[in-house]
Amino acid sequence: MQAVEMEKKAGNENPMREVVLDKVVINIGVGESGERHKKAYSLLEELVEQKPAITYAKMTIKNFGIRKGEAIGIKVTLRGEKALKFLKDALTVKENRLSRKSIGEGYFAFGIAEHIDLPGVDYDPDVGIFGMDVCVSLKRRGYRVARRRRKKAKIATSHRVTKEDTIRWLESLGVIVE
């Protein structure tokens, strides 16, 4: 840890310690299958220009009218430039402000009440209005070591992304953390 502090004082920032965007996951929980689910699917596909994945109910909940195996949601994972572009648009909906409570160690999440709040999206009466959850994951370079198939290894505690690192990364995007 002392080596990291000394390096920062010297002004030599190690490129492996840089916090980078890993992925952005967008989820629309429709709660029912059928026509409304198909509309949400086409909406998300149109928004991100990528094919979404359908999520299915894990168990039957009679009070909600949901059966096990029924399609009840849609999600899509964005990476790279596409993820950063969508994230910036989604943060403008929240007026570039996030609560400290929605930020964790290497991740943060927020919700968008209406998709028509996103820039460049107009209301279509045929589709309706859908809300969505946006979950963002951050990492440092070298995290593949923990996920790869061969010669897996643990990530050192000093190399993990902390809550303070996440807040600093958000502030570099111009987001105000309250």
UniProtKB/Swiss-Prot annotation:
Keywords from the UniProt entry: Ribonucleoprotein, Ribosomal protein, RNA-binding, rRNA-binding, tRNA-binding
Superkingdom as given in the UniProt entry: Archaea
Any one GO biological process: translation
Cross-referenced Pfam families: Ribosomal_L5, Ribosomal_L5_C
Record PANTHER family: 60S RIBOSOMAL PROTEIN L11-RELATED
Protein family according to the UniProt entry: Belongs to the universal ribosomal protein uL5 family.
Job of this protein: This is one of the proteins that bind and probably mediate the attachment of the 5S RNA into the large ribosomal subunit, where it forms part of the central protuberance. In the 70S ribosome it contacts protein S13 of the 30S subunit (bridge B1b), connecting the 2 subunits; this bridge is implicated in subunit movement. May contact the P site tRNA; the 5S rRNA and some of its associated proteins might help stabilize positioning of ribosome-bound tRNAs.
Name of the protein this chain belongs to: Large ribosomal subunit protein uL5
